[in-house]
Amino acid sequence: MKIKSKILIIAGSDSSGGAGIQADIKTATCLGVYAMTAVTAVTVQNTKGVKSVIPIPPIEIYNQITHSTKDIKPNAIKIGMLHSTKVINKVLKSLNDMRIKKIILDPVMVAKGGSKLITDQAIQLMKKKLLKKVSLVTPNLPEAEILTGVKINCKEDMIFAAHKLMQFGVSNVLIKGGHFKSKRIHDIFVNKNEIRVFTNNRFNTKNTHGTGCTLSTAITSFFSCGKTLKKSCELGINYVN
């Protein structure tokens, strides 16, 4: 198979294989994209919840990033689980070192079973320093509420929350609407020039573990191949569907 591009994935490992680094690698590979990884934490989990989180020392996360990218230059970066301020600071340092412009942030905060995966201090640092470094942020509804303080009950609230996120410096926002209990799912892409609503039918399935990881990596893969962010979001959503 011909490799279309290369991406670096900075995220946690999921022992069940459905989410995290494992889902990221599978997604990139299916789309013909070469995936490098920097593991931020090892999680013991399954589709029902997280049993434990074993953090990787921040310096070793930094070393994974710098050592791999000195040899293989990524076209884009996808960032997932960053559980502490020390980890975020090391990732910020590595981003400054690499100066890569195409960066997608999936702000993983709460596991499907309800386990919290990030400290409150790390959330504040993400808002203050990391969001302004990325091209696109892809929160689900609970994550968007945590980041903005906005209670989201409808599409208009999603758009308002997206504009609140842009106040932290990120230029493009994709808020995922899958947590609404509606028959149709609305994902909303927002930047200063436009608002695009992607609407799809909800599938009657319990196999939703890792859909956020899969989507953000699919978007990163398409973006790394030269597609625009809006088109990458459209193609990524279609891929997950």
Where do the language-model regions lie?
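Conserved N-terminal subdomain of the carbohydrate kinase-like
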Residues: 2-9, 23, 28-112, 116
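Glycine-rich beta-alpha junction loops
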Residues: 42-43, 83, 109-111, 178-180, ...
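Short, well-structured alpha-helical segments that form the helix of a local strand-helix-strand
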Residues: 158-166, 228-241
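Conserved phosphate/ATP/ADP-binding segment of small-molecule kinases
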Residues: 120-195
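Short, small-residue alpha-helix embedded
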Residues: 22, 27, 146, 205-229
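Short pre-catalytic strand/loop immediately N-terminal to key active-site residues, enriched for Gly-Thr
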Residues: 10-16, 195-209
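Phosphate-handling active-site elements
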Residues: 31-36, 196, 222-236
